Amino acid sequence: MQFFNFLLFYPVFMSIYWIVGSIYFYFTREIRYSLNKKPDINVDELEGITFLLACYNESETIEDTLSNVLALKYEKKEIIIINDGSSDNTAELIYKIKENNDFIFVDLQENRGKANALNQGIKQASYDYVMCLDADTIVDQDAPYYMIENFKHDPKLGAVTGNPRIRNKSSILGKIQTIEYASLIGCIKRSQTLAGAVNTISGVFTLFKKSAVVDVGYWDTDMITEDIAVSWKLHLRGYRIKYEPLAMCWMLVPETLGGLWKQRVRWAQGGHEVLLRDFFSTMKTKRFPLYILMFEQIISILWVYIVLLYLGYLFITANFLDYTFMTYSFSIFLLSSFTMTFINVIQFTVALFIDSRYEKKNMAGLIFVSWYPTVYWIINAAVVLVAFPKALKRKKGGYATWSSPDRGNTQR
């Protein structure tokens, strides 16, 4: 029975934690600021931002993204594009745009991964702050102002991660991910910000203090997710990371099951690589929020394997002809299903209410409230089974390269 309690109440406890954290964050920090007014900033005192765009085979999206960044009204900006040895015509497109626009183009001839590309770019950055964007990102006009404002009040702030929104919503899979980002992922980042440590910045859209990135030794070229890896390096050096929901961008997500699976396995593998690398270093720190983040990841992995072992044990020892046993098992199943569904409805309703401030039409996603978070846990469990062994086999000292998943339809 203790095993069952753990299997059921771990996801329930985490959902409640995210709900409470999101509500508190919203009423104490988020609701006080207007979406229609950017922070009051004196242009003469405005900090400059270098925008870094690393791209590999992004010919379908790089023109839109680069045009967007060039059109941003942020008064002090520098743009550096790094082509990471693309095998398509990405470089040709960038050279063509450069004929009529002012930006720095670093054209690497060999594909050595996003981390290496960012490292090459930041070394040429003139300003003290660098904005890292993916090649499919469309940045909201006011986002840089909201993000840079955070650094005024916290000298130990190393990075501010923004609020990514989904551009492609034409398919069912696109719509589901829209709701996922609006509810589950938004809840998690709000709660973690309150707890004092965000597990990871969003690689698609984050503003870094350049000196902090240099201090931690830049991005790791041998880690499959450079964003998670640099987040923990910042944590361990005493820097803080904040989530800024008012700073929005628009990105593309996979619209095929294969593309989504590939993306989630990479994310999970990257998290596990960081866990294996940084566990002992984390235990030596005196930052309690980092202990919470680390043990949350460990418990998530253990939860998956305990579920499998427990289900296997039940299957082997079950007497399917025993009416009492079957009745009891079915009752437990109904209880757990009702509990999870009830919590899911509350979590989705709260999250989408908060998120409706940014996209009111996302409230239509309430149709998914009863089942998607449960599916989310099941998908994550399957991903862990594949990703954790990959993390154990990580080759240190090389270059971690990967291709972007399918980007779907670009319609907003």
Curated annotation (Swiss-Prot):
GO molecular function: acetylglucosaminyltransferase activity
A matching Pfam family: Glycos_transf_2
The UniProt record lists the keyword Methyltransferase: no
Gene Ontology terms describing biological process: cell adhesion involved in biofilm formation
Signal peptide annotation: none
Swiss-Prot/TrEMBL keywords: Cell membrane, Glycosyltransferase, Membrane, Transferase, Transmembrane, Transmembrane helix
EC number(s) on file: 2.4.1.-
Database matches in InterPro entries: Glyco_trans_2-like, Nucleotide-diphossugar_trans, PGA_PgaC/IcaA
Location in or out of the cell: Cell membrane
Membrane topology: Multi-pass membrane protein
Gene3D superfamilies cross-referenced by the UniProt entry: Spore Coat Polysaccharide Biosynthesis Protein SpsA, Chain A (3.90.550.10)
Superkingdom as given in the UniProt entry: Bacteria
GO CC term, one of those recorded: plasma membrane
Residue stretches spanning the membrane: 6-26, 298-318, 332-352, 366-386
Disulfide bond annotation, renumbered to this chain: none
Effects seen without this gene: Deletion of the icaADBCR genes leads to the inability to form biofilms, produce PIA or mediate N-acetylglucosaminyltransferase activity in vitro.
Function: N-acetylglucosaminyltransferase that catalyzes the polymerization of single monomer units of UDP-N-acetylglucosamine to produce the linear homomer poly-beta-1,6-N-acetyl-D-glucosamine (PNAG, also referred to as PIA), a biofilm adhesin polysaccharide. Requires IcaD for full activity.
Family of the protein in this entry: Belongs to the glycosyltransferase 2 family.
Protein name per Swiss-Prot or TrEMBL: Poly-beta-1,6-N-acetyl-D-glucosamine synthase
Organism annotation: Staphylococcus aureus (strain NCTC 8325 / PS 47)
Gene name as annotated: icaA
